Amino acid sequence: SVGFVIYPKQQKIVLTFGMFAGNKWDVPDDNCYQMIDQVIKEFEKEYPNVTIKYESGVMKDDYSEWLSQKALKGDLPDVFMVLPEDFSTFSSVGMLKNLDSYTKIDKAFKKSNYYEGSYDAGTYKGTQYALPYESVPTLMLVNKTLLKKEHIKMPGNHWTWDDFYKICQKVTKDTDGDGRLDQFGVYDYKWNDATLSNGGNLFNQSGTKCNLSSEPIENAILFTKKIERISSFRNLTSDDFDSGNIAFRPMTFSEFRTYKPYPWKINKYFDFEW
């Protein structure tokens, strides 16, 4: 006798994806669709019964309204990006799916693959509603040439506020004897930069409470003022840093990519090592 095994035909599935053009940090990004298209291509190859579609051309400034209108019409994409400023609202009104059950049963999923801070940003009241797509850390750029000139060792990865303050204090000076300061410690260092380096956060993990009156933020504000006092509260500009007259400058990684020579139109060149 001859036996036949009949397998059910795989059902065709269409998934919709919501995204905006560019990125959250407003720096040039020619690859936003290229990256998504590549991921879709690989996913559809692994799951040939699934087709993924998305609407291109939605700008970041219009994205929140576009997504909200989709929600009101009951036409939300199956998977979509969420801007940080919308996350708490969307989570609280039920627009986002609880992902905890999925992360627990997916053997390929590893929380350790994400930066802890980025992963936690997708948590609302103890529940995971989103996963990071892009993570952009803030870097501290260092003018190595200036530190070498002043016989100062490069700070290590575990440097402290006190180390930072002492270096800023040492490099800030009048180098040409005209009675005016022309070399400085740091440019564009804000209280929120100090807060993050001090383990503080502006909001609690669920985004429901502001921590402005907390001790870490209070200390960060006081430290920032202390740093500014070294340079007599001078209104410094990026040109001062570009000219090699400032030792430090905080900058996000996305800004850094377009600041140094990179395949964008915004290219800057320096006469010092950093």
Task: Label every model-predicted segment.
Residues I167-C168, S206-N235:
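Glycine-centered hinge/linker elements that transmit conformational signals in sensory
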Residues D100-Y114, N157, D176-G177, F184, ...:
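Short, solvent-exposed loop/beta-turn-alpha elements that line the ligand-binding surface or hinge
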Residues Y124-Y133, T138, D162-C210, I246:
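Extracytoplasmic/periplasmic solute-binding protein
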Residues V58, P84-P137:
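Hinge/lid segment of periplasmic solute-binding proteins
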Residues S56-W66, W159-Y165, F233-S243:
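Short helix-initiation/N-cap motifs at beta->coil->alpha
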Residues D78-M81, A247-T252:
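Paired acidic/hydrophobic, glycine-rich loop segments that form the ligand-binding mouth/hinge
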Residues S1-T89:
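Conserved N-terminal structural module of periplasmic/extracytoplasmic solute-binding proteins
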Residues E42-K45, T51, W264-W274:
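Extracytoplasmic/periplasmic substrate-recognition and gating elements
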